Swiss-Prot record:
Primary localization: nucleus
Keyword annotations: Activator, Nucleus, Phosphoprotein, Repeat, Repressor, Transcription, Transcription regulation
Name of protein: Activating transcription factor 7-interacting protein 2
Purpose of the protein: Recruiter that couples transcriptional factors to general transcription apparatus and thereby modulates transcription regulation and chromatin formation. Can both act as an activator or a repressor depending on the context. Mediates MBD1-dependent transcriptional repression, probably by recruiting complexes containing SETDB1. The complex formed with MBD1 and SETDB1 represses transcription and probably couples DNA methylation and histone H3 'Lys-9' trimethylation (H3K9me3) activity.
Tissues where the protein occurs: Expressed in testis.
Record has Transcription regulation as a keyword: yes
Residues found modified as Phosphoserine: S184, S257
InterPro entries: ATF7-int, ATF7IP_BD, Fn3_ATF7IP, FN3_dom, FN3_sf, Ig-like_fold
Keyword Repeat: yes
Coiled coil: none
Organism: Mus musculus (Mouse)
């Protein structure tokens, strides 16, 4: 059995460790027991067994108080942890809200800056547009002036009948020259029928003439004449480029009759360059076809004293040529060129004119395309075919392949073949290898003294 003092010490110790709420309850209980105890002691004497029961009850109360205190402590810890988690969640939510607000603010600020920039650039754009419109108007004015000047240049300059040497399809001109004037001047002057050419295309070019391909140098001008002569069994090429000026010859009358005479002045000129590409070996056409000597001059000058005769025009090709052999069939274009030629048309049909030139005796050929179709591919070369009567070969012969230059083009052919009539045809070939239709066949009779 424990002594009462020891029990009291335990009770005091338990009181000290108890929370304040439980201590207050315990004090209330002690007061009630202290009040009841004197009453009982006054009336009767309490035995020891009753005291033991009282101490056991107090002990149980102390245990209950300890358990409740532990429960309260655990509840307080859980509550503190829960509040800490809530504070952390609140902090995270605040951060997210701040980020969203910042992004939205940045977006709105960028939109506002863009609107401000657009409003500020509007005036600048209007100023730039005004400058562009002014430049466009100036450019349009310049284009109009250039086009008008080109149209004026492209129009044929028709001169009066007393100052112009003009040969049409139905009329011919004879030019007479005295022996003295011919001897005193250059002997290399040759003439062709004068066809009006475009004065806007003035460009003299050097030409390279192999035995199978003839390349021309042409200057498109109303003053230009292109001469080519062909002779004997070797394809001999001599090209002379000249640049001179045509001077008008007034007080000369011109009639439409073939016997009318036109006097033109002597030609005093220095050749800029002469290219002689004569090959000593025989050409491809030395056996089966008539062979020629080709000469080309980009310009010829006519003055008021020397007379160059031109014979009458050849047949315009309206007659019947049923007795002639068929023209050669052109080869088909290469299959790999099919994709490139989809949007283009084959070459157009040229128009050919044939005339006799009296000094030196040669045949002048000129060809042109009156209306050029822009959808056609550029022409690479022109092929010249010849057929002459009293020949052993009953087929057309290609006598020259001429590099394409600005139209119209011209050439002269001089030959010594015994034939009563000559027939000519021209065919064009484009850069893709396609051949166009042949021109209308032109014929011209053998040269005779009656033409003079």
């Amino acid at each position: 059995m424990e002594s009462p003092d020891r029990k009291r010490q335990k009770v005091l110790k338990a009181k000290k460790t108890m929370p304040t709420s439980y201590q207050k309850q315990l004090e209330i209980l002690n007061k009630s027991t202290n009040v009841e105890a004197p009453k009982t002691t006054v009336g009767t004497n309490i035995p020891n067994g009753h005291n033991q029961k009282m101490f056991s009850k107090n002990k149980e109360n102390v245990k209950v108080m300890k358990v409740s205190e532990q429960i309260n402590e655990n509840a307080c810890g859980a509550l503190e942890r829960h509040t800490a988690l809530l504070e952390q969640v609140k902090h995270w939510i605040r951060q997210e809200i701040c980020m969203i607000n910042c992004n939205l603010f940045d977006k709105k600020l960028n939109e506002l800056n863009e609107r401000i920039g657009k409003t500020q650039c509007k005036s600048r754009h209007e100023a730039i547009a005004g400058e562009l419109f002014v430049k466009i108007r100036r450019l349009q004015k310049r284009i109009k002036t250039v086009l008008s000047s080109q149209r004026n240049c492209l129009e044929p300059n028709t001169l009066p009948s007393n100052t112009v040497c003009k040969v049409t399809d139905s009329e011919a001109m004879n030019l007479n020259v005295t022996q003295k004037s011919v001897k005193s001047r250059s002997k290399r002057i040759s003439s062709v029928n004068h066809t009006p050419l475009n004065s806007s295309e003035k460009a003299g070019r050097k030409t390279n003439l192999p035995s199978t391909c003839v390349e021309f140098a042409s200057e498109s001008n109303t003053d230009d004449v292109m001469l080519i002569s062909v002779k004997n069994s070797n394809l001999t090429t001599s090209i002379t480029s000249e640049q001179t000026e045509i001077r008008k010859n007034t007080s000369r009358n011109l009639s439409n009759s073939p016997n009318s005479m036109i006097k033109v002045g002597p030609v005093e000129k220095k050749f800029d360059f002469v290219i002689d590409l004569t090959r000593e070996g025989p050409s491809n056409y030395s056996i089966e076809s008539p062979s020629f000597t080709l000469k080309s001059t980009s310009k010829a000058v006519l003055r008021s004293k020397e007379i160059i005769p031109v014979a009458e025009n050849g047949n315009e090709g309206f007659g019947s040529f049923e007795h002639l052999p068929p023209l050669p069939e052109p080869p088909a274009p290469l299959p790999e060129m099919a994709d490139k030629i989809k949007d283009t048309l084959p070459p157009q049909k040229p128009e050919l004119k044939v005339k006799w030139v009296l000094r030196p005796t040669s045949i002048a050929l000129t060809w042109n395309i009156p209306k050029v179709n822009p959808n056609c591919a550029p022409v690479e070369s022109y092929h010249l075919f010849l057929y002459y009567e009293n020949s052993d070969h009953l087929t057309w012969k290609k006598i020259a392949e001429i590099k394409a230059l600005p139209l119209p083009m011209a050439c002269t052919l001089s030959q010594n073949l015994a034939s009563t009539k000559y027939y000519f045809a021209v065919q064009s070939k484009d850069i893709f290898g396609r051949y166009g239709p042949f021109c209308n066949i032109k014929s011209i009779p053998r040269f005779s003294e009656n033409l003079t």
